[in-house]
Amino acid sequence: MGKIKILEESVAARIAAGEVIERPAGVLKELLENAVDAGADTINIDIDGAGKKLIRVNDNGSGMSKEDLTLSVVRHSTSKIKNFEDLDSLDTFGFRGEALYSVAAVSKLSISSAEEGGSGNKIIVEGGKLISVSPSPNIKGTTVEVKDLFYNTPARLKFLKSDNYERSLLLKVVEESALANLHVSYNVRTDGRLVYSFLASNGDFKKTVIQRAGQILGAEIAVSLISVEDERFGFKAFLTPLSKLTAVRDLQFFFINKRPLTSKTLQQAVYKAYHGRPKDRHPAFIVFMNMPAADFDVNIHPQKRDVKFAQENAVFGFLMNVTQRALTGAAQPVDINITPASPPAATMEFSFAKPRAEEPSYKPFGQNIVEENVFAPISKQAVVVKDFEDPVSYNPEPAEPKKEMGAHVQTDNPSWWQGPYRFLGSLHKSYLIYETELGLMLVDQHAARERVLYEEYLKKMEENELGIQPLMFPVTVDLPASNVENLMLWKDWLKTAGFEIEQFSPRTVLVNAVPNIFRFKEDSLKEFIVSLAGIVGDPLKSSDELKKKTVAMLACKKSIKAKEDVSMAEADALLLDLKRCQDGMHCPHGRPVMVSLSAAELTKKFGR
């Protein structure tokens, strides 16, 4: 065993920096918190190279003297606290005195600052070493430039994901800061392009929140938000009604004392209030709460994202109840005009140009299928929703079918497949009834069509036989800037899946082509892209998993809906299609496609 030695200060600093600064988004978060703590009401942000080349934050806050400027990059130097007891009454974001020290250890850092009426000064620090201190223009405020992040820690640099992904995290930090600090105006540029411009509040809290939500969540969601307030915990929230749930779960924001936080307790409380929602639909919300610093703890980790409450059950119950009352009460959306992120498209019939590949020759359902919104809530007949599924850890499992009236759920390819069989009709326009030699067989027409479309799409995609349908007019889809970055990560793969997209602006994408196996209406296509942007947000997911999720979602939403009439020819064709499937007994989500009732069971039921 080697001898124990004390690490050099520069090595220890780089190791410690990894706890505070994990990626560019962590740097930006610390710089924005410092700017807000300094009393700034205008913050300008420039990002180049996804934050690896440059992160610049300029503010008009109180600024620093020369002495404070040189101390700002020294470890555990802070103006926020003086002793341990101060941790119980914090009203600032930063407090550890580690942020700038950690940033300086793994980058080339420069800080220019001046107090009102004082002289300006600039320091340069590289790899934790002070290079110079020099005069600078005496403009009140502070400008921090972080260049070549992780240049001296290649392992950390290698750990970073693609530029699109890192940019999406950076923009998420800005979105959170902008919602938390309505009195501050923000101007954000990435690689020279203006992405966000938020004007400072004129004192109208609701109006400012809705206007900022219009840029971040999208105008359509923002105008539907319900406003609710309660004196307890200084509670103010903006929630989508049950009729306006979204296909993604990342349009959710919690703030306590203006600090953005993640909390399973808070998230589960809100989801509990939305009980009965289809499991593939999620609320969008912005929740503000205030409470004494001693009643909650964010000092669990240097990132200060997770929170623990002194009275967790009380907070959970309060949030669940007040949200439930808002959803079931007479609350109305806030009546505020929202300027759309991009000019509205001209109203037109959604049409296709000539397809690039032949239309599929086998169309058992013809062209008269009702074209519903592909993300309309699934019928409750097809989905059993628990009171609450953890929105963070939930993974859909095959539903355990109920055995009602002695019916047997088919789980493997049985003799029930064998002919002859005769279509008798449908039950509630949802379940197809067939007579077989063994008895009765009931098929869930929605789940069956879902399975057929799922396998047909996968097969065509894997065999490179997927037909592409170019759109006569591109469809514009507005998204949060962070979601646009996520979606563009998968642009090339989406092309192989039949979807051709391109970025039109920092918050808008264009859809130029779709797979010809699906027939979209414009609204349906827009909602699909919004949902897709949420699903592909995590680049750690393998492309195979992404394919399955994408195909399952499309197949489910474009299958025959419950309550649709099916002719005898269509019913017979559907059964033939199911027999050709690798797994004709289950929908892609694991739910059963059919149940059977044998002649013997019928005889027993009638006591014969």
Curated annotation (Swiss-Prot):
Any GO CC annotation of this UniProt entry: mismatch repair complex
Gene Ontology MF terms: ATP binding; ATP hydrolysis activity; ATP-dependent DNA damage sensor activity; mismatched DNA binding
BP GO annotations: mismatch repair
Keywords: DNA damage, DNA repair
Pfam family, one: MutL_C
SUPFAM superfamilies: ATPase domain of HSP90 chaperone/DNA topoisomerase II/histidine kinase, DNA mismatch repair protein MutL, Ribosomal protein S5 domain 2-like
Family to which this protein belongs: Belongs to the DNA mismatch repair MutL/HexB family.
Record-linked PANTHER family: DNA MISMATCH REPAIR PROTEIN MLH, PMS, MUTL, DNA MISMATCH REPAIR PROTEIN MLH1
Function of the molecule: This protein is involved in the repair of mismatches in DNA. It is required for dam-dependent methyl-directed DNA mismatch repair. May act as a 'molecular matchmaker', a protein that promotes the formation of a stable complex between two or more DNA-binding proteins in an ATP-dependent manner without itself being part of a final effector complex.
Protein name in the entry: DNA mismatch repair protein MutL
Annotated source species: Elusimicrobium minutum (strain Pei191)
Lineage: Bacteria, Pseudomonadati, Elusimicrobiota, Elusimicrobia, Elusimicrobiales
